[in-house]
Swiss-Prot record:
This function is generally fulfilled by the C-terminal part of HisG, which is missing in some bacteria such as this one. Heteromultimer composed of HisG and HisZ subunits. Pfam families: tRNA-synt_His. Coiled coil: none annotated. This is ATP phosphoribosyltransferase regulatory subunit.
C-alpha cells in the first residue's frame, strides 16, 4: 500500500480540525440550548441498528443512502443511520408512548452511502427537532419558527423559505383515480415543471381534475399564488381545500412573526412526497444550490412502530450551518503553561485554576518554554517566594 493511500479519505468524508471543530461544538451547544428553551428534550439514537428497524417507515431513497453491514454476532443485516428522524419517531411511538404532545431534539453524525447532491458531504452532522401528538397548523408554525430562530442564532444571511403541501397533489391524484405508476410519473414531471409531460399524463383524467393537476406546474411564486390557487382549485376535493387553508394559515402566522422573511410558494413542489403527509418547507440562501434546512409533516411514520401519531419537524447539517453563519463563536484563547514538576502545591494550584475555567497545559519532560507558544499559552506558572503565581509568558 502506498503511503498516500493510508491518509486518503473517501469522497464526501471529511475530518474536522481545530479550531473549526471547536466552533462546531460551541454552535451545537448553543442550538441545543435554544431547543431546550422551547421545551424540546434531547435524545441520543444508535449509530447502527438492524436494518428492519432502521428503515421502517422510510422511503426507498433512505434505503439507497444507508451503508449496510452484517452483524458478526447475529448474522443479521445492519445499517449505519443515514437519517435520525425515523429513529426519533420510533422513540416517541414505541419507547416513550406519551399521550400528549412530545417535543424531542437531536444532534449527531450520519453516514450516507450516496451523497444527497453533487459534492455534498456524506458525513453530515444532522441536527433537528420534532413535535409529536398534534395535527394542527400551530405545530407546523412552531417548528418552522424554531428553525428560523436557529438560523437567526447562527446569523445566516439572506434566507428565504419555500412552502408547499403534498396533500394538494395527493388529493387531486386520488380523486383522479391515478394508478401508482402514473401517479409516480406525474410526480416526476411536476418536479421538472415538464408541462408537456403533465398534459400527456392527464389525458384520460376528467377535464376539471386534469385542469387542476396541470395548474400545479405554474402555481409557484409569492403570496399571489395562494389567491390564484383558490381560483384554479375552487372545485377541488375537500382535502385539497383544507390543505390550501393550512398553507394560508401557516403563511399568515409566519409573516406576522418574521415580517422580513421572503416566502415563496410552490404547490407543485413535492419534496419528500413519499415520506411527508402535509406541509413541507425548506430554507435556501443565495449561492447554495440545495436547501440548508428543511422539514415538514409526516403523520404516518409512527404507525410502522405500532402507534400512529401526528408529527412535524425539521433538520439541518450543523457543519453547513456553521459555515454559512456569520455569528461570532467565542473560542477560549490563551492558556497557562504548567512546568514539569511533581510539587504538590503546584498541582493544587492547577486544579484550582482549572475549576475556575482556566486552560492549563502541562509541560512534558524535556519540553522547552518555547513549546508554550505552540500550545497557545500566554501565561505561565512560576514559583515566587514559595508560592506558585500566574505570570505573563516571557517573550
Amino acid at each position: 500500500m502506498a503511503t498516500v493511500d493510508r491518509w486518503l479519505l473517501p469522497d464526501g468524508i471529511e475530518e474536522v480540525l481545530p479550531p473549526e471543530a471547536a466552533r462546531i461544538e460551541v454552535a451545537r451547544r448553543q442550538v441545543l440550548d435554544l431547543f431546550q428553551s422551547w421545551g424540546y428534550e434531547f435524545v441520543v439514537t444508535p449509530h447502527i441498528e438492524y436494518l428492519e428497524s432502521l428503515l421502517t417507515g422510510a422511503g426507498q431513497d433512505l434505503d439507497l443512502r444507508t451503508f449496510k453491514v452484517i452483524d458478526p454476532q447475529s448474522g443479521r443485516q445492519m445499517g449505519f443511520r443515514a437519517d435520525i428522524t425515523p429513529q426519533v419517531a420510533r422513540i416517541d411511538a414505541h419507547t416513550l408512548r406519551r399521550e400528549g404532545p412530545s417535543r424531542l431534539c437531536y444532534a449527531g453524525s450520519v453516514l450516507h452511502a450516496q451523497p444527497r447532491a453533487l459534492s455534498s458531504s456524506r458525513s453530515p452532522i444532522q441536527l433537528g427537532a420534532e413535535l409529536y401528538g398534534d395535527a394542527s397548523p400551530s405545530s407546523d408554525v412552531e417548528v418552522i419558527s424554531l428553525m428560523l430562530a436557529m438560523l437567526q442564532l447562527a446569523d445566516v444571511p439572506d434566507v428565504h423559505m419555500d412552502l408547499g403541501h403534498v396533500g394538494i397533489y395527493r388529493g387531486l391524484a386520488r380523486a383522479a383515480g391515478l394508478s401508482g405508476e402514473v401517479e409516480q410519473q406525474l410526480f416526476d414531471a411536476l418536479q421538472r415543471k415538464a408541462i408537456d409531460e403533465v398534459i400527456a399524463l392527464t389525458e384520460g383524467v376528467p377535464a376539471d381534475l386534469a385542469g387542476m393537476l396541470r395548474a400545479l406546474v405554474n402555481l409557484c411564486g409569492g403570496r399571489e399564488v395562494l389567491v390564484a390557487a383558490r381560483e384554479r382549485l375552487a372545485n377541488a376535493p375537500a382535502p385539497v381545500l383544507a390543505a390550501l387553508d393550512d398553507v394560508l394559515a401557516i403563511a399568515e402566522q409566519l409573516s406576522a412573526r418574521f415580517p422580513q422573511l421572503p416566502l415563496y410558494f410552490d404547490l407543485g413542489e413535492l419534496r419528500g412526497y413519499h415520506y411527508h403527509t402535509g406541509v413541507v418547507f425548506a430554507v435556501f440562501v443565495p449561492g447554495v444550490g440545495q436547501a440548508i434546512a428543511q422539514g415538514g409533516r409526516y403523520d404516518d411514520i409512527g404507525a410502522d412502530f405500532g402507534r400512529a401519531r401526528p408529527a412535524t419537524g425539521f433538520s439541518t447539517d450543523l457543519k453547513t450551518l456553521v459555515t454559512l453563519g456569520r455569528a461570532e463563536v467565542e473560542l477560549p484563547s490563551g492558556g497557562i503553561w504548567m512546568p514539569d514538576s511533581t510539587d504538590a502545591a503546584l498541582w493544587q494550584q492547577v486544579c484550582q485554576l482549572r475549576s475556575e475555567g482556566q486552560r492549563v497545559v502541562q509541560a512534558l519532560p524535556g519540553q522547552p518554554l518555547a513549546a508554550a507558544r505552540e500550545a497557545d499559552c500566554d501565561r505561565q506558572l512560576i514559583l515566587q517566594n514559595g508560592l506558585w503565581q500566574v505570570s505573563p509568558l516571557a517573550s
